[in-house]
Amino acid sequence: MPSVSFEDSTSPQRQALDWMLGDSYSLEELKNDGDDRIVQRFALAVFYYSTNGPTSWDLENRDGWLLSSTECDWGERSFGPDVECSNNNVVDRISLWSDGLSGTIPREIGLLSSLTFLGLSRNNLEGTIPTEIGVLTSLTGFSFSRNANLSGRVPTELANLSNLEVLNLSNTQLTGSIPSSLCSTLAWAYIDCGEIECDCC
């Protein structure tokens, strides 16, 4: 991960840090849980601020995040949680479909190293897919479809995702190609063939 400046008080990273420093759970309950839990909480908070959680997320989602409790309780809703965890409080799934997300996907997503699924379809995300997606080697599926302003080239680091089975990048402005090394694992891929080359799609 690249170094991050916290001097800009409006940056998602600084906002996440300020929130954690004012959150009793972050300061008290996590102090005996080790660095991994602190990093996970920080990464999710950065994601929230980077995708404009306080201003553009749907109200139910907005009120369900940055709670003074375990991250595994965030985003609990009647039809399914935004965040799912393994038994040891490690986040392994994020599902935020049609929830009003805008802004950009932060590089800190790569800190959530146990993610198996990342679903961010039907939102208003822009910018590029961060190259740090390539360190999420446990991913079996991710969907960023119907984010019309998501642009740039598909990261070549996708080649590292040797467990990837499901990929949806349709209805975006992404270009480039899908690494041929994924052909042996992909069971389902939905992309814009006119913009993204794929030998196995």
Question: Model regions: which residues?
Answer:
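LRR flanking "cap" motifs
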Residues: 2-104, 195-197
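Leucine-rich repeat
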Residues: 83-85, 88-90, 108-115, 118, 134-139, 147, 167, ...
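Leucine-rich, hydrophobic repeat-scaffold detector
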Residues: 90-124
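Conserved hydrophobic beta-strand positions in leucine-rich repeat
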Residues: 94-96, 116-120, 139-144, 164-169, ...
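Conserved "Asn-ladder"/turn position within leucine-rich repeats
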Residues: 99, 123, 147-148, 172, ...
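The feature encodes a structural signal of leucine-rich repeats
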Residues: 102-110, 126-131, 151-156, 175-180
